[in-house]
Amino acid sequence: MDRIVEIEKYSFDETYETSLRPSNFDGYIGQESIKKNLNVFIAAAKKRNECLDHILFSGPAGLGKTTLANIISYEMSANIKTTAAPMIEKSGDLAAILTNLSEGDILFIDEIHRLSPAIEEVLYPAMEDYRLDIIIGSGPAAQTIKIDLPKFTLIGATTRAGMLSNPLRDRFGMQFRLEFYKDSELALILQKAALKLNKTCEEKAALEIAKRSRSTPRIALRLLKRVRDFADVNDEEIITEKRANEALNSLGVNELGFDAMDLRYLELLTAAKQKPIGLASIAAALSEDENTIEDVIEPYLLANGYIERTAKGRIASAKSYSALKLNYEKTLFEE
C-alpha cells in the first residue's frame, strides 16, 4: 500500500503538482540562496544572448527540482523537454532526443544518476562541444559520424549525487543542492495552493499540515489534498486547524510526520539499545527492499537527527526515544 508521506511521486502527483506549481521565481517559496544565484546567472546569460551552463540539482525527492527546471525554462523563454534516465536505455534513445532539440532548448533529465556508462559517453561531447558522436558498424570497419547539435542547456536532477560519475558531474557548470523546507515556508506554500483549490487555509491549519509534512513540499501538497476532502465532505470553505488535525490523525500521520512504517523503523532501532543494525537486517525486518529504506524512509530521519549511520549500521539517537515517548538510560549516549 502507498504511504501518504511517501516522497516518491504517485501517479496522480504529476498533474496535481503541475496545477499548483509556480511558473516563475516570484511565486517560488524557499531555497533562497539557489533562487538568488539562478536569477543572476539567468540575467547574465540573457544579457549575453547565450544558453545557460548545464545545471545539476541534487537533494531528497519532492523538494522542487522539477519545478525549478520549469521556472528556468520560463525565465529563459526556452522550450523544455523532459525525460527520465530509466527511459534512456540505448545510445540511440539519447541521440533521438538530442537531435530533436532546437537552439536554446532545455533538456531536463530526472534521476540522472541512473544513466548507464555507455549513455554517459554519448552525453559528454554533447555537453562539452554540442556534438554527437555516433559509431556505425563494429570492429575494424566501424566508423564515427559526428553530428553538430544546437546549443542547449542540460538540467539534471538526482536524489543520489554520490552515484554520479566524476566525469559527468564535472561537466555541470552549476551545481545546487536543495535543502529541506522550514515549516513556515511550507505553510506559505500550502496557503497559496489552497487558494488555487478554491479553499482558504487558516495559518494554524497550514502550520499543522506543514509540521507533519517531513519538511517536503510534495508531501505537504498531497496532505493538503486529503485535508481538503475532509473539508468538502463537511461543506467547509475554510480549512481550520481542527479539521486539519482530524484529517491528519485519520490518515495515520502523527505530529512529527511519522506514519506506521517510520514508527516500526524507529521501534526496531530503539529496541536494539544502541547496538548498530545493518541495512540488510532492517530491510528484512520491515519487509522492504534496501533502496526503499535508504531513499524513502531514512533521509528525513537522518536530516532531523532521529538516527545515525555508522560503519557497523544504524543506531537510534536520544531524539528517537523521545519521539516514541520511551525512557532510556543516559549512559547509552555517553562516549
From Swiss-Prot:
Enzyme Commission identifier(s): 3.6.4.-
Annotated stretches, region: Large ATPase domain (RuvB-L): 1-181
Residues that hold ADP according to the record: R21, Y28, I29, G62, L63, G64, K65, T66, T67, Y181, R218
Keywords assigned by UniProt, alphabetized: ATP-binding, Cytoplasm, DNA damage, DNA recombination, DNA repair, DNA-binding, Hydrolase, Nucleotide-binding
Alphabetized InterPro entries for the sequence: AAA+_ATPase, AAA_lid_4, DNA_helicase_Holl-junc_RuvB, P-loop_NTPase, RuvB-like_N, RuvB_C, WH-like_DNA-bd_sf, WH_DNA-bd_sf
Catalytic activities: ATP + H2O = ADP + phosphate + H(+)
Positions of the UniProt region annotated as Head domain (RuvB-H): 255-335
Binding residues for DNA: R309, R314
Pfam family name, one: RuvB_C
GO MF annotation: an example: ATP hydrolysis activity
CDD domains: AAA (cd00009)
Predominant cellular place of this UniProt entry's protein: cytoplasm
Biological function: The RuvA-RuvB-RuvC complex processes Holliday junction (HJ) DNA during genetic recombination and DNA repair, while the RuvA-RuvB complex plays an important role in the rescue of blocked DNA replication forks via replication fork reversal (RFR). RuvA specifically binds to HJ cruciform DNA, conferring on it an open structure. The RuvB hexamer acts as an ATP-dependent pump, pulling dsDNA into and through the RuvAB complex. RuvB forms 2 homohexamers on either side of HJ DNA bound by 1 or 2 RuvA tetramers; 4 subunits per hexamer contact DNA at a time.
Domain notes: Has 3 domains, the large (RuvB-L) and small ATPase (RuvB-S) domains and the C-terminal head (RuvB-H) domain. The head domain binds DNA, while the ATPase domains jointly bind ATP, ADP or are empty depending on the state of the subunit in the translocation cycle. During a single DNA translocation step the structure of each domain remains the same, but their relative positions change.
Binding partners and assembly: Homohexamer. Forms an RuvA(8)-RuvB(12)-Holliday junction (HJ) complex. HJ DNA is sandwiched between 2 RuvA tetramers; dsDNA enters through RuvA and exits via RuvB. An RuvB hexamer assembles on each DNA strand where it exits the tetramer. Each RuvB hexamer is contacted by two RuvA subunits (via domain III) on 2 adjacent RuvB subunits; this complex drives branch migration. In the full resolvosome a probable DNA-RuvA(4)-RuvB(12)-RuvC(2) complex forms which resolves the HJ.
Entry similarity comment: Belongs to the RuvB family.
UniProt-recorded name of the protein: Holliday junction branch migration complex subunit RuvB
Lineage summary: Bacteria, Pseudomonadati, Campylobacterota, Epsilonproteobacteria, Campylobacterales
Gene behind the chain: ruvB
